[in-house]
Amino acid sequence: MARSVWKGPFVDAYVLRKAEKARESGKSDVIKIWSRRSTILPQFVGLTFGVYNGQKHIPVSVTEEMIGQKFGEYSPTRTYYGHAADKKAKRK
């Protein structure tokens, strides 16, 4: 079920504070965040966030198309290695 419109988008308070501080300083450093559940807002465009995937921070450069999505969508938590090959089929 989607979030109701009257509530507005959810963003952790510390993410807003870090983004505001980065905007004021003008530095282009990676902003490390652990909040994968936070929504990407228009004021985040142009900033680079390091989104934690459980092991390391994946750098995510925010663009216009990402607005309204969640940070977690751009930092995969699982590695796909492909399906195991059929050993019987290889021998023939």
UniProtKB/Swiss-Prot annotation:
GO terms for molecular function: rRNA binding; structural constituent of ribosome. GO terms for biological process: ribosomal small subunit assembly; translation. The keyword rRNA-binding applies. GO terms for cellular component: cytoplasm; small ribosomal subunit. It comes from the Bacteria. Pfam families: Ribosomal_S19 (PF00203). Keywords: Ribonucleoprotein, Ribosomal protein, RNA-binding, rRNA-binding. Belongs to the universal ribosomal protein uS19 family. HAMAP family: Ribosomal_uS19 (MF_00531). NCBIfam families: rpsS_bact. Protein S19 forms a complex with S13 that binds strongly to the 16S ribosomal RNA. This is Small ribosomal subunit protein uS19.
